Amino acid sequence: MQGLAVSCQLPPAAAAARWRPRASSSNREAVLQCWKYELSQDHYLGGPLRIGQSQGSLHRHRSTNFLRPAAAAISVEQDEVNTYLPKGDMWSVHKFGGTCMGTPKRIQCVANIVLGDSSERKLIIVSAMSKVTDMMYNLVQKAQSRDDSYAIALAEVFEKHMTAAKDLLDGEDLARFLSQLHSDVSNLRAMLRAIYIAGHATESFSDFVVGHGELWSAQMLSYAIKKSGAPCSWMDTREVLVVTPSGCNQVDPDYLECEKRLQKWFSRQPAEIIVATGFIASTAGNIPTTLKRDGSDFSAAIVGSLVRARQVTIWTDVDGVFSADPRKVSEAVILSTLSYQEAWEMSYFGANVLHPRTIIPVMKDNIPIVIRNMFNLSAPGTMICKQPANENGDLDACVKSFATVDNLALVNVEGTGMAGVPGTASAIFSAVKDVGANVIMISQASSEHSVCFAVPEKEVAVVSAELHDRFREALAAGRLSKVEVINGCSILAAVGLRMASTPGVSAILFDALAKANINVRAIAQGCSEYNITVVLKQQDCVRALRAAHSRFFLSKTTLAVGIIGPGLIGGALLNQLKNQTAVLKENMNIDLRVIGITGSSTMLLSDTGIDLTQWKQLLQKEAEPADIGSFVHHLSDNHVFPNKVLVDCTADTSVASHYYDWLKKGIHVITPNKKANSGPLDQYLKLRTMQRASYTHYFYEATVGAGLPIISTLRGLLETGDKILRIEGIFSGTLSYIFNNFEGTRAFSDVVAEAREAGYTEPDPRDDLSGTDVARKVVVLARESGLRLELSDIPVKSLVPETLASCSSADEFMQKLPSFDEDWARQRSDAEAAGEVLRYVGALDAVNRSGQVELRRYRRDHPFAQLSGSDNIIAFTTSRYKEQPLIVRGPGAGAEVTAGGVFCDILRLASYLGAPS
């Protein structure tokens, strides 16, 4: 028998349709009496079962893995004697939810998974087909509301299962299932009609109606398994699972009674594969009921405990348990293992893992639960067990996951009269209990001056009213100063078994929240230290979750990068990042994510990282109008990544003027742009002060010498106690190229034109020939050496003839430049006659605190005369390198080498943040 029998004859549908109850209690009672049904215990157990216990207990027989009663301990009267329920590792328990059972194709996939399990015995718990439970509840609700459409809704339920069965089954199995389906639906139609007439249904009656979804899905799966030739039985768990109400809409299993009934059931149907209904059970009085929320998972855990299964596998549509809600944190990862306590804490604080009560039955027998994805069998899933493996190393593994609870209110009870007064906390929470509110978290100051607790926002009004009423006298007398309610709160919980043994976890968590500008309203931590719970504004919750998760789960050297100026240097940098990012992540655990690229007119933004293999195409197709404020806000407001850096690849003064504000926001800055370090001295000093105060990094190696280690060499000398006497060098790659190639065979103007065509000069060569760029580099080095010089303090001898400085365009300048070729030829000839060459240099005299930029002559054996191409050369004369200067030489111009210098600064930043050297 598949359904539960009603003990009295229900009125035929036609007769019931003609009859309408009067609004009288006697009529209502008459109809309610009609619903009463009684289940025979004989139906469940095949005969009365009596159990008497003296002093023994149940023991597992070691050799056979059967459950055997201790001698004279238990006597069981049943029809079959000497029939024992096998227990232990031979059993594997699987649970498939409604999504897994949603279609005939999926039910067949479930059957294939079951058949692929090599366990000796398998017990399969199934939910109703997807959305059927809601449909069944809706049937009862419609009937209670006297909505005639309940009949149409019932027909839809019937059609759904009939269609599924026809797609899945055939032959005699299909006929049997459809016959039972017709019978059950006919009974349901009569029962719903009775509800319609009375306008009311008891909870047990509703549970009986709703439970049919599980009955039908279990039968369909058992028939599908039988098609393969495997022996299979199906179990109505109302015959086995006995529960008692425990308050708060919960039930507790009666394990002893469940064990007796399961043993009796198995004596009649000892199949190797058992398909059982989830969610439904019965009371001790054999009244149908349900296991409430997440009941099917609970069913699997109870049955797994009863048979001492090897493991319980919960099949879902996700790959396992995430370290955080992946809908809120895109970087959430699948956890391979969790402890029972961690899973319980996560479930309590809202993580979609398991209901906390699901863990209790298996926890006492150390039975692991595995969460797996039916739609991705290659994913190993998450194992919940007693002793989980470490995930990511020491500190990273101490926090396993983060969970949040929204829509809460914080209630704060405060007053000097609370301190040292016994019973105050008891009175507070007694009042909360009396109104039936659920306390999520409690925090009390050690001074006993205040206590606060979080409750669901929908319950806070009655809680507040009850507290004001209960403590009216104390409030009036001033013993309590206030009962305050703060709405719009959320809880963020960090969960981890190893938090108790790992120093510094709280510091890391609160540092992450502080850097995300999150204000914490309350804190709680149990003495077990399995979790740290903080209460914060609900509007800050997602930002807090991302910030905390990134600190513990992303690499310490995960950098969110924003690139300003995707031109020659910026474009070269992006291509270098594209080619090297994967290598850095694999070899050095440096994770670079470019989440923004902006030019002067358009910008491209991403929350998690731009695909650098097609950044140019994306910048054209998906870009939005450029706005430097919005661009920086996008970077600073992204709390997925713990560290942010802005890379300015422009030569723009207005962009450089923002460095101070970016550093103040906690954003690191890297740039080859000289404008900030050679600009007004007061602004430069303000910038450096902010950089130190904000604990951010400001790197600018490529401002002098492109990719050459000029700044770092100078810093190394100064930091080790050396004293700078003089710095002299050829700082311009453009001018180095021009004078290295001006050897007398070609006119000066021709060499300049060649350099312009090769891309060595600025669009207007006067910007290079003026010497201002070299002067800026001298100022950068002077300030790095501790000299407070302005750009105006550096005399510059420009190479631009005075009469050509006013040319309206670069083309006009290039047309008129040949008129000065004779002058340049004469200077070159004079130098050559003296065995010298012309070189344009910048010089810093640290002793006299002065600098200059000019054209000089050097002997052919001088290092400055040995250059080729666009090489730079810088000579450091110091107290240690006084007789023979320290020389740094190499290519000093070009997008690739400059971008390489910027890239080195990015890696230097990663090293400062914790990357291995």
From Swiss-Prot:
Residue positions binding NAD(+): 569, 650, 894
Family classification: In the N-terminal section; belongs to the aspartokinase family.
Protein name, UniProt field: Bifunctional aspartokinase/homoserine dehydrogenase 2, chloroplastic
ACT domain boundaries: 413-488, 494-571
An annotated GO cellular component: chloroplast
Residues annotated as catalytic: 777 (proton donor)
Binding site for NADP(+): 569, 650, 674, 759, 762, 894
Chain segments carrying region Homoserine dehydrogenase: 564-917
Positions of the UniProt region annotated as Interface: 339-563
Pfam family, one: NAD_binding_3
Lineage: Eukaryota, Viridiplantae, Streptophyta, Embryophyta, Tracheophyta
